[in-house]
Amino acid sequence: MAEYKGSSGDGNRIRMLEKQRENEIKEINKKKEKLKEEKKANVFSIHDKFQSVSDSSSSTSTQFQNVGLVSINDFHNNIKSQNNLNDSKNINNKRQTEKEIKKKSIVNKKLKITQKSKLSFELDDDGDGDGENNENNENNEENNENNEENKNDKENDEDNVNNNNNNKIKYFGKDPSVNTDFLPDIEREELEKLEREKLAKEWLDQQERIKSEEFEITYSFWDGSGHRRSMKCSKGTTIERFLENARKEFKELRGVSVDKLMFIKEDIIIPHNYSFYDLMLSKARGKSGPLFRFDVHEDVRLVNDATVEKEESHAAKMVESSWYERNKHIFPSSRWEYLAEDGFDTQDTDRKYTISDRLAKH
């Protein structure tokens, strides 16, 4: 074999590389062994995962339930459930056997009592008394046992009822301190409706009584000069009805229809469909005085104040429309005006007659 002939530094380098290579091979072998061990640990036996049906520890009922391959968790769960059933059966069997033993002991006691020798009548009486006492004691014992069983059953029933009550959903109740006036309430709405109807009826009845009241009106037939008259009529009388009755007082107007007559109050021409009640209710005023007063009086004052409205009331005028058309450019008919289309606006301070209010202000 040929030898490498070189410098000492090259030889050292070769030896270092060989050692490094050996170390790497060792590390690779260690990793391979570690992987093999991990694979072995992850592999489970079929007996660990499943258990055969022919296991001697399981009973016949569990063998019937575990047909075929069953996971070990299911297998153990089935065994636990079966053991619980067996325990409950054993407890019931013990109770029954105890009851049977007690009954047998009672029967044996009765037999012993009957087999006792009867030496005298007193002994018989005593024996009968003892037998009766024993029987009573035995009956009391049976009754006590039955009562205890009934108590246990009742306690179990009460526990079940309490559990059911706890499982029920608890709903929140209403808070009586909360204001619920904004919520719809049929009863409250019906009461409010009845109250409104009652108040409306009372108001209408009151207005009808006011309309039926009589008052005196001073008027004149105006044809350039006044022919004054006075008449009594109800407050609900319309202007048309008043003109129909008033024209009969004058010979000149007996042949004139109501449609050709005009009614003027305080320089305002009032339509025929209005009533005196409307004029009084509106508290309106005309150009020279109030429209709701139909008597005649003058407001005489020592000091005239232009800021305070006068209380003078003038007589109403009844005029033929033909005369008005001919003389409407002459005083006083030149001052007359038709009532506005909106009628008596009580919110209009220019038309509303408020003497007392203005006196209070000034």
Swiss-Prot record:
Residues 80-103, 118-174 are annotated as: Disordered. Residues 83-93 have a biased composition (Low complexity). It holds the Pfam family XAP5. GO terms for cellular component: nucleus. Residues 122-147 have a biased composition (Acidic residues). GO terms for biological process: chromatin organization. It comes from the Eukaryota. Belongs to the FAM50 family. PANTHER family: PROTEIN FAM50A (PTHR12722:SF0), XAP-5 PROTEIN-RELATED (PTHR12722). This is Protein FAM50 homolog. It comes from Dictyostelium discoideum. The gene is fam50.
